[in-house]
């Protein structure tokens, strides 16, 4: 007995779709079970927009839908059960439990633990009765004591946390949401008075919360048709909560912009007290699709005294921040190099620093360099056989820069010159080093106003972001190069 998804929809005539989704919750773990149980008859749960339109059509609540349709309006299709088959993308999502009450549509999709073709009797689907119980419980919670729109919005904002307690992983434990809310509130008060054994002391002083998001981007670029470039973002959220009391409670929310890249492979600190199942099931192993959970990512927690890493995550961003190619041509004791770098237009063009390190292994010291750089400066470290292209703090308006030159080497001295077992012959790389402050490649951020602190005093909340290059290599496209894959960049 479980639910695949739950919706609360406000029926509002005159809006573009005829209604507004006020709340929705999907259970990815239940959805995977549905895919196994239903087999070839499986129909995925659609996004909110398509589902809203299809459900309003089936309930005959669309403003512009007045025509008679045999499949929906004939006498043989009179609905007496509030259970519908909703047409979505040429298929039919069934069973959908839905009813309209006081301008609000309550809907859910129960799990059917067998094939849907032929349709099993309703009495054999235990998730349907559980779905009705859940929806009636939500209806009672929203209607109790509600007088104004602000009170309704407050209760809607509490639903997400309440369903974590009353319906974890889509399985209903308690349909009385008000009792659950009261128990959560009373528990938060009583627990503040008890010092946990793992917390060695309490903080005394001005309350403050500091949250820092650091993303590191890895990349391997080859400029070859037969080898795909790879890149990946690895992020960490670091927190320091200086709050009075033995058990202060904090809720931190990570948000993404509309075009942000969903966070995956999320690992959380043990101090996190509860978590939406959709956060834990988002994995980089699975193929990305439009249904990927894109936040907000809420972390209710009881913070320790010291600084701690709230969570780690990865993300599959669509493009690397800097694209480039590197070509090396050998002529006797000389090397001719060509480098081209381009900053992607979506990336913030403001660096704390940006450098390209170009090492030359298994050769003698650099004796002479002739070069032409369209931007920045070139520093030569002769004994280390290293060129450092200092790009600076900003790319030019064209977002593209280039470097070409000829390097002459002296006789080898195996004791002093850098040696590498991979970079032999033409195999060579350029490594980028950069840092961008107040920016993340995924777009992930913490809104100061979304941080909830349940402790004495009003804390000062500080948030920081930065993007740092990690293993960011551009290999010589004119020679063999070691190949890596996205899953190995971790």
UniProtKB/Swiss-Prot annotation:
Probably part of the adaptor protein complex 5 (AP-5) a tetramer composed of AP5B1, AP5M1, AP5S1 and AP5Z1. GO terms for biological process: endosomal transport; protein transport. Belongs to the adaptor complexes medium subunit family. It is found in: Cytoplasm, Cytosol; Late endosome membrane; Lysosome membrane. As part of AP-5, a probable fifth adaptor protein complex it may be involved in endosomal transport. Residues 206-476 form the MHD domain. This is AP-5 complex subunit mu-1. Its main location: cytoplasm. SUPFAM superfamilies: Second domain of Mu2 adaptin subunit (ap50) of ap2 adaptor. It comes from Bos taurus. The lineage of its organism: Eukaryota, Metazoa, Chordata, Craniata, Vertebrata. The gene is AP5M1. GO terms for cellular component: AP-type membrane coat adaptor complex; cytosol; late endosome; late endosome membrane; lysosomal membrane; lysosome; membrane. It is a peripheral membrane protein. Keywords: Cytoplasm, Endosome, Lysosome, Membrane, Protein transport, Transport.
